[in-house]
Amino acid sequence: MAIRYVRKIGDEVLRKKAKPVTEINSHILTILEDMAQTMYLNDGVGLAANQIGVLRRLVVIDVGEGLLELINPEIVYEEGEQVGAEGCLSIPGVVGEVKRPKKVKVKYLDREGKEREIEGEDLLARALCHEIDHLNGVLFIDKAIRFLDEEEKEQVKYFGNMSRGW
């Protein structure tokens, strides 16, 4: 396992669409492990493979309920609406309000290659959408309704809504 460099805004890899994983092998599993370690070291909520320069459809997420590893994730259902603050490990210091579905269902493969589904609401739904957007070359700043100023960012941190980055 290794800590990977998190690519920052301006790096063209963040704007590229990731390719599906066709074979789950030791290389893919190592990337997932590196992604999780990198996410935790950076105090993140999620990380997409694009963010470490790997153009494969891989995502790791932990909203405080344990690590999720998703291979080839795809949103198959969404409902409702929520607006909330988002940041990104690839765009340090920027926080914006983004409209997302309140609830999503995502189909994906686990590390054994079994097809799974996960339903997420609130923060998990937001994180799933945010990371899957990354896989499609879309950043939260593309969808932000508005950006928070420094005082607002401090208030959001104080109330615990942004205690961890994306």
Swiss-Prot record:
GO molecular function: metal ion binding; peptide deformylase activity
The EC number(s) this enzyme carries: 3.5.1.88
UniProt-listed GO biological process terms: co-translational protein modification; translation
InterPro entries with a match to the protein in the record: Peptide_deformylase, Peptide_deformylase_sf
UniProt binding sites for Fe cation: 88, 130, 134
Catalysed transformations (reactions): N-terminal N-formyl-L-methionyl-[peptide] + H2O = N-terminal L-methionyl-[peptide] + formate
Lineage top rank: taxon: Bacteria
Note on cofactor: Binds 1 Fe(2+) ion.
Identification of the protein by name: Peptide deformylase
Annotated source species: Thermoanaerobacter sp. (strain X514)
Classification of source organism: Bacteria, Bacillati, Bacillota, Clostridia, Thermoanaerobacterales
